[in-house]
Amino acid sequence: MEMLKFGKFAALALAMAVAVGCSSKGGDNAGEGAAVDPNAGYGANTGAVDGSLSEEAALRAITTFYFEYDSSDLKPEAMRALDVHAKDLKANGNRVVLEGNTDERGTREYNMALGERRAKAVQRYLVLQGVSPAQLELVSYGEERPVATGNDEQSWAQNRRVELRK
């Protein structure tokens, strides 16, 4: 019981730390060059999170899911947040858009296909959790919508993502 409480506290604290470090109120360049560790937290950029939120609410706030280089495999940490989103989608019937993105390496055509594979991986997981495919719209932007413009691993890692848009 003590370990469960500690685990929930640690998860919430980590989500809040990522949220505080990643939130931005900028204009068109918001997030450009931001220092986000895509392997931290639940593998997602959470935005602002209130300290009184439950673990489920913290997971619900996660809407960006990061991927390894040249991969469309979901990370286990991302699956936890997607479980909460699946529960919500089944309950309310809302539609969401899954936007697949890549870093700039590779050809435009390859990156469009990789972005689509990433969006499909999230879609497949949500459908396996009971979400209707009709609720999920997929789009791939490939390398066209970077959140970080640097030419380094940290920037590329921030761009290898799927964003869940409501």
UniProtKB/Swiss-Prot annotation:
Pfam families: OmpA. Residues 147-166 are annotated as: Disordered. Coiled coil: none annotated. It is a lipid-anchor. A lipid is attached at residue 22 (N-palmitoyl cysteine). Keywords: Cell cycle, Cell division, Cell outer membrane, Lipoprotein, Membrane, Palmitate, Signal. GO terms for biological process: cell division. A lipid is attached at residue 22 (S-diacylglycerol cysteine). It is found in: Cell outer membrane. It comes from the Bacteria. The keyword Oxidoreductase does not apply. The Tol-Pal system is composed of five core proteins: the inner membrane proteins TolA, TolQ and TolR, the periplasmic protein TolB and the outer membrane protein Pal. They form a network linking the inner and outer membranes and the peptidoglycan layer. Part of the Tol-Pal system, which plays a role in outer membrane invagination during cell division and is important for maintaining outer membrane integrity. HAMAP family: Pal. This is Peptidoglycan-associated lipoprotein. The lineage of its organism: Bacteria, Pseudomonadati, Pseudomonadota, Gammaproteobacteria, Pseudomonadales.
